[in-house]
Regions:
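N-terminal and secondary-structure boundary signal
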Residues: 1-281
């Protein structure tokens, strides 16, 4: 069908898909790829989206979980899941995976990118319409930065506006000249530091740009209430960097920075987006 949408208007599409029973039995998840055309004053642009339909037939049990010793007082349990997608309600999904595993006084941590993916906060790089400004501004960043590509920079411009980006860059240059680094990211946080460019995420999301999660504080509050334990959302890398985006209890942040320093969830294709931190008796 062809539809006319006004600026900033939302279109909801309901699909009914008939699948063979043999296919459902043999696969743990299915991919739904949608191709569509965007037509307007700019001409025609071919776009595509990808969604994961997950069956979640293999929830983990306590006996399946392997412990990693952090020190004499802490151990961590990476929780392996199926591939997560935008059709997985975040709180309900994590509860299903962890309710038979967590114990009293445990702390549950989920990565910021898996949470953002379940919230549908990712975009195919082919759908991003970048302009001359984003192509120019991305050259001011380190080649490995997610803002060092026109698409990554355009995402940030779309979120914060061109004016704020320019002002932040100017102040960043001024302060860097006198020996103070990181001002740009301070002025554009949290959006700028949470963008993961393509190849920064597990397949099939390695061709998408993942934004930071929406309202992680509320997610922590809901999940903490349901499981009766503390919950946190973290951004962790293999270099020992640990950033706690949100938590149900601020007093656990110092402990989490110790427990997560070696990145027990991993940054490759481990499929362990959830980590249980447990205090040893």
């Amino acid at each position: 069908p062809t539809l006319i949408l006004k600026s900033n208007e939302t279109l909801k599409i309901f699909l009914k898909i008939n699948l063979k029973e043999t296919l459902l039995k043999s696969e743990d998840f299915l991919g739904l790829k949608i191709n569509w055309d965007n037509y307007g004053h700019f001409g025609k642009i071919n776009k595509q989206d990808f969604f994961l339909l997950n069956k979640h037939t293999k929830y983990r049990k306590q006996k399946d979980i392997k412990s990693n010793i952090v020190n004499q007082k802490l151990e961590v349990f990476p929780i392996k899941t199926s591939l997560l997608g935008a059709f997985d309600e975040p709180v309900e999904t994590v509860i299903n995976y962890c309710r038979d595993i967590v114990k009293e006084d445990d702390i549950l941590v989920i990565g910021e990118s898996p949470l953002a993916i379940m919230q549908g906060r990712y975009e195919n790089y082919l759908n991003i319409e970048y302009d001359i400004f984003s192509k120019f501004l991305c050259y001011f960043f380190h080649p490995t930065s997610s803002l060092a590509t026109a698409s990554g920079m355009q995402i940030l411009i779309n979120k914060l506006g061109f004016t704020r980006i320019i002002i932040s860059l100017i102040f960043g240059f001024i302060f860097k000249f006198i020996g103070i680094k990181g001002i740009f990211y301070r002025l554009t946080n949290p959006e700028s530091s949470l963008i993961d460019d393509i190849s920064g995420t597990i397949m099939p999301y390695d061709k998408t740009i993942v934004l930071g999660p929406y309202n992680p504080k509320l997610f922590c509050k809901k999940l903490s209430k349901a499981l009766k334990i503390d919950v946190a959302v973290a951004d962790v890398n293999d270099l020992g960097g640990v950033k706690i985006l949100a938590s149900s209890n601020k007093s656990i942040i110092k402990l989490l920075k110790i427990a997560l320093k070696k990145n027990p969830a991993g940054n490759a294709d481990e499929k362990t987006p959830i980590v249980i931190v447990r205090r040893k008796a």
